[in-house]
Amino acid sequence: MRVLTPSLYIYAFFIFCVRFKCGNRTTVASAIRASYDMPPKELRVGDMLKKTSQPNCNYRTRGKCRKFFFVWKLDKMRDAHLGVQAKRRKNHLRSGSATYEASLGEHQLKGKRKESATNVEKEKKEKEQQEERLPVPKVGNKMPEKKPDWFHVPAPTGKKYNKLKEDLKKLKLHTVCEEAQCPNIGECWNIGTATIMLLGDTCTRGCKFCSIKTSSKPLAPDANEPFNTAKAICEWDINYVVLTSVDRDDLPDGGASHFAKTIELIKFSRPEILIECLVSDFQGNVDSIRKLANSGMEVYAHNIETVRRLQKFVRDRRANYEQSLRVLKIAKEINPMLYTKTSIMLGLGETKEEVLEAMSDVRQHNIDVITFGQYLRPTKNHLNVVEYVSPQMFDFYKEEGMKMGFKYIASGPLVRSSYKAGEYFMKSLVEQRRGAKTHAQG
């Protein structure tokens, strides 16, 4: 009868342990593959088969002991790993899924990240499909059948209207009231209020809602325009004036120097007059913004025109939503004493949620005043009106805006960015600030 050697007993015990711990696995390799989802770095067989320092392993039996202690170490590693996982799950229940996922290893999060990326792509695609279904304004599209009654305004007439028109023509000055075909021209001019348009009557941009003439190379600005503007304003019996301009991307500074010179001349002649300036974005040029912000004006205005989604359909490609908001923010940072102002046209296919989102973005950029008005198509060659927004909806946006913290909101079908209703309120705001400043200096 053959006697079994101790080495055979050890080997048989090793096979039993492998079968017991790893199911039907009969080799070391298959045992490794059934390693209870342990981290890859802990599965290096070379690390687990290093020379052991166990006291019962002498030189002859060291190799056999390694096999035994491999199973022993595998078991210990498995228990430790499961213990860590249990602790993580416990923390997950206490502090939420974000903490739990942050505690997981890279190999464990790989599947979740892949699934998360797929969900993000799916949501993005669904959002794009929803936006495609929303109406957008286009040149030549069908207009609403009938203009509501609240848009019927009387034709511009009156002595002041005629005198103002003659003065502007004599001094070769342009107004946005005429160029943009504003429906309030008769009302504003009869109380001696006009919005002077500087830098000529030709714009270098081609926004699809605007009726002002366009050209890539307009005539050079009139050098006498700042003097003529200051002369006209000083002759008129007004305390609040609005200056605006066309976009002049052909000029190095966008026309900022010309604009600033006009303001300085007006302030030199009549220091008490309040000036609001509706300016371009100057392509985001900080030096041009600084020049205007420090020129002496009280109100710095620049319009975002419409909600984020409709920017590419409504505005020139050189203008964008983020840049317009950034311009107003920079102006306020340069001169904190300025009031900043913007305007949004309604009726171009925007949704209520998009308008509220735009209002929130505007307020986050520390802009003080916002106005809302109905878009009206100047000619058949411009964007169509998607809808006529009701006066009740304009009132709703005004109420929501006041909750957001705007200092003033002008909201109505016929309201425009330089509408007189806003001027009265802005005048009182500026005078209050002036009084507070004088009191503090005294």
From Swiss-Prot:
Keywords for this protein: 4Fe-4S, Apicoplast, Iron, Iron-sulfur, Metal-binding, Plastid, S-adenosyl-L-methionine, Signal, Transferase
Signal peptide start and end residues: 1-23
Basic and acidic residues bias locations: 114-135
Domain of life: Eukaryota
Cofactor(s) in the UniProt record: [4Fe-4S] cluster
Region annotation (Disordered) ranges: 104-154
Binding site for [4Fe-4S] cluster 1: C177, C182, C188, S418
A single GO cellular-component term on record: apicoplast
Residues spanning the membrane: none
UniProt-listed Enzyme Commission number(s): 2.8.1.8
Record note on cofactor: Binds 2 [4Fe-4S] clusters per subunit. One cluster is coordinated with 3 cysteines and an exchangeable S-adenosyl-L-methionine.
Annotated positions binding [4Fe-4S] cluster 2: C203, C207, C210
Name of the protein in question: Lipoyl synthase, apicoplast
Organism: Plasmodium knowlesi (strain H)
Phylogenetic placement of the source organism: Eukaryota, Sar, Alveolata, Apicomplexa, Aconoidasida
